[in-house]
């Protein structure tokens, strides 16, 4: 018994020593020779040059343009991916959900990405709660960033605009008033799976709503469900981004993405 206690104590001390070694405030010993500045300079490979947009919110030079207001060439019907996206283009400026037609999804598949998307509630403000300007952005066709008219419109906190639906409420409500355009700027990290199909580590997401941080690198706890608890039922790779038809004439414009 005493021997077991002694071993346990030594293991605990060893763990503390190891932790201190890993996170020491002292610089590592690299050489008996004095350090020079150039010894810690990394020159190759050079960092890729990307030209930023002249207008904040517009696409940088390496972005994939998913929607520019002119056509839906990058999208297909979610009901039948062999058919064109059934939503309508308005004034060569934005697209509008056609209620009952079903969601739409990208032709391309994505994993880790930076996404910019702008949206507006329907022109006519009606209904309340989840019935007002409802839609959603689904990453890898599974994990929903909620779209809702949350301006003076109370609903459950993990279901309002900029929530990771029924998973994480936003840090604040940064919704603009009706008829104004809103923007999401998102950094999404896809989940990773082991060779046997089990989860290695979950998806994570950071969201800025109209320039305001509302999701700070939060863990996505699994598949978005209306009823039930979040989980990761199966392994998957890159997949489409989809926009939800929730029966409201929600509008979208200026959608672009950068693969990360």
Language model segments and positions:
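Bacterial Sec-dependent N-terminal signal peptides
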Residues: 1-22
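Carbohydrate-interacting regions of secretory-pathway proteins
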Residues: 20-260
């Amino acid at each position: 018994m005493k021997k077991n206690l002694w071993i346990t104590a030594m293991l605990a001390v060893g763990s503390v020593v190891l932790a201190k070694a890993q996170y020491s405030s002292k610089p590592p010993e690299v050489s008996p020779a004095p350090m020079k500045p150039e010894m810690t300079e990394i020159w190759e490979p050079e960092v890729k040059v990307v030209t930023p947009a002249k207008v904040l919110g517009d696409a940088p030079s390496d972005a994939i343009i998913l929607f520019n207001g002119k056509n839906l060439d990058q999208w297909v019907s979610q009901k039948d991916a062999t058919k064109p996206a059934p939503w309508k283009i308005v004034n060569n400026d934005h697209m509008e959900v056609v209620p009952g037609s079903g969601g739409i999804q990208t032709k391309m598949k994505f994993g880790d990405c930076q996404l910019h998307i702008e949206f507006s509630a329907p022109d006519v403000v009606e209904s309340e709660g989840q019935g007002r300007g409802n839609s959603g952005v689904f990453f890898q066709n599974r994990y929903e960033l909620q779209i809702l008219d949350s301006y003076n419109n109370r609903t459950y906190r993990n279901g309002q605009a900029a929530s990771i639906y029924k998973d994480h409420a936003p840090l604040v409500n940064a919704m603009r008033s009706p008829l104004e355009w809103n923007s999401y700027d998102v950094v999404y990290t896809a989940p990773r799976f082991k060779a046997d199909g089990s989860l290695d580590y979950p998806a994570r997401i950071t969201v800025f709503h109209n320039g305001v941080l509302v999701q700070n690198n939060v863990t996505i706890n699994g598949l978005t469900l209306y009823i039930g608890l979040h989980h990761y039922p199966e392994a998957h790779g890159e997949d489409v981004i989809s926009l939800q038809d929730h029966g409201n004439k929600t509008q979208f414009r200026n959608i672009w993405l950068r693969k990360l």
